[in-house]
Amino acid sequence: GMDALDIMKRNGNPGQKGTGNDLGEILLYVFLEQVLGAPKIMSKVELQTGAKQYGSKCDGIHLLSLEQEFGMPYYHMVFGTSSIVGDMKKAVDTAFDAIVEIEKQSTQERTLAENTVFSKSFDKDTVQKIKDLLIPSKGQSIPYDTAYGVFLAYNLGLNPANYSAVDFRRALTQKMDTDIRNHAAYIASKINALGLGNHSFYFYILPLNDADAEKTQIMDRVMNGGGRP
């Protein structure tokens, strides 16, 4: 709605990182909430406001229930980070640079999430679960671990003008599959080298035609209704 757009415009320029107007921050939120099914505890904007004292590097904090998988109450507190860079390897490196910083501050991030939860409009059952999780009563603690949600966007490197619509879709799928395969081992090596092997990771990857330009152009269109003439 217009209220949301007004708030976005007050927070910063289209595509400005750390304001909630960054395409990566928004798509990270969508993937974690809609695809992973992890409700948001704090958005980037809320973190920027609440974490001024230590400068949060996190792009969002979400909570994922894994009770169905494990047959007992168990959660992942998912710290989010996003990176939109033309070169996929650089996008991965940028995301892991942020993860290293988040890891250093994970105690502060958790405390901030704990303090925020009470003002959230979760349903009563969810609020109670989160309270039990974050502030266990004596003798009762629900197990949870911290995990990372990572959104990456990069240049696909295909020119749509060279393909029919159907062929482009096919080429896109093949190229993306190849790109992800080529970088999977690199991502695994980063996780091991940085001593992050005890965390779960949720990766979401999106190819763009020109990542560096489009991350601003798309947000400009969203915030300014079709962009400037």
Give the positions of each predicted feature.
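Extended, charged low-complexity segments
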Residues: 163-229
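Acidic, metal/cofactor-coordinating or nucleic-acid-engaging core segments within structured domains
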Residues: 90-185
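Extended hydrophobic secondary-structure segments that form protein cores and membrane-embedded regions
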Residues: 78-81, 147-153, 202-207
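Interdomain/boundary linker segments immediately adjacent to catalytic/signaling cores
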Residues: 1-19
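Acidic-basic catalytic patches of nuclease active cores, encompassing PD-(D/E)XK
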Residues: 13-45, 107, 114
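Flexible loop/turn segments at secondary-structure boundaries
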Residues: 86-88, 157-159, 211-213
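Loop-centered beta-sheet repeat module
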Residues: 39-104
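Short, well-structured alpha-helical interface segments that form or flank functional binding sites
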Residues: 23-27, 55, 90, 144
